[in-house]
Amino acid sequence: MEERELLHTDGLSVGYHGKELIKEIGISLKMGEIVTLIGPNGAGKSTILKTIAKQLQEIRGSVYVENINLSELPEKGLAKKMSIVFTERITPELMTVADVVAMGRYPYTGGLGILTPKDEAVVAQCMEQIRISPLKERNFMSLSDGQKQRVLLAKALCQEPEILILDEPTSYLDVKYKLEFLSMLQEMTRKKKIGVLMSLHELDLAERVSDKIVCVKGENIENYGTPEEVFADGFVDQLYEITDGTFQEKSGCVELKKCGGIPEVFVIAGNGTGSFLFRQLQRNGIPFAVGILGKNDIDYPAAEALAVQVIAAEAYQDFEGEHYEAAKQVMCACRKVICCQTVFGSQNRLNRQLLQEAEDCGMEIELWQK
């Protein structure tokens, strides 16, 4: 059964002071779905999020929350449906973690902000869910960035929203806290069926955590679809105008620009034995060639990105004589051979012959292991 739609935009244009920056934005968010905005710095991701969160006025078009026009929702009514965590840091003085989390109950408390037993139970439940209960008596300002971000997530959950909007929630976090935070977010969307709309700079994480990706650049949405649809055919390189390297769609990581020129080193690799060496050679400014690899080999994406020349066979095909002759010709023009492989089988037997050919020719050979 298809999940209920929580939010959608219709012909939305956003900007500042009446000037349109991004036009005709059409996106939707369903229960239990994570939708992520990506794009270059200054593309307008935060502007879109702030407009959807009613912090900026729409220039044209509309935002609908469960088919109710955003303009018709009162502040407290919206706060019961939508919570936000933006990049601007809050600096509450002399407030404990529990105090900050409890601020999320403001849509439900009176003017004095007095918590009822139910409110206190929700605060405790949210701290437990985000695993910050042991910190509840700590001063918020004494926490690490990762801990603060978890507290702000718990505060947002205290509103008991259906929609959660996050602007670059992992920007200040190290890799451990990034993974922990996004894992919590993913678990929360599954269990509570909350819809999450956020922006991320980390493309590898966006690819892994998102159900849909919205690509923001220029005056329009450049692309909108599943990660499998967006992270394909070199689109990310085009979106970010990458020239000093390339985004590897299969791995979700980036490789720096290859060293040009005539290959000085020939690398015999495969089965993941060569990728670290390829990067080491690139760092040292040494142009190199690689062979023979299958195009399905784990080393192939890095080789294709960093090597001047790659002699490769089609995926799942045996290496043939033509591959051997092409590799031999390139290898013999190099000053050195580096062999990363220690095990040779039936498929890569021609790589063993290449190594033997290098020995017979008296070439300098280095056996390399990570």
Give residue ranges: language-model regions:
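Conserved ABC transporter NBD signature motif
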Residues: 61-69, 78
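Conserved ABC ATPase "signature" region
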Residues: 102, 117-135
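Conserved catalytic motifs of ABC-family nucleotide-binding domains
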Residues: 160
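The feature captures the beta-strand-to-loop junction immediately N-terminal to the Walker
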Residues: 38-40
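Catalytic Walker B motif of ABC-type/P-loop ATPase nucleotide-binding domains
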Residues: 164-168
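Helix-to-loop junction immediately C-terminal to a conserved catalytic motif
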Residues: 53
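ABC ATPase nucleotide-binding domains
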Residues: 241-322, 339-352, 364-370
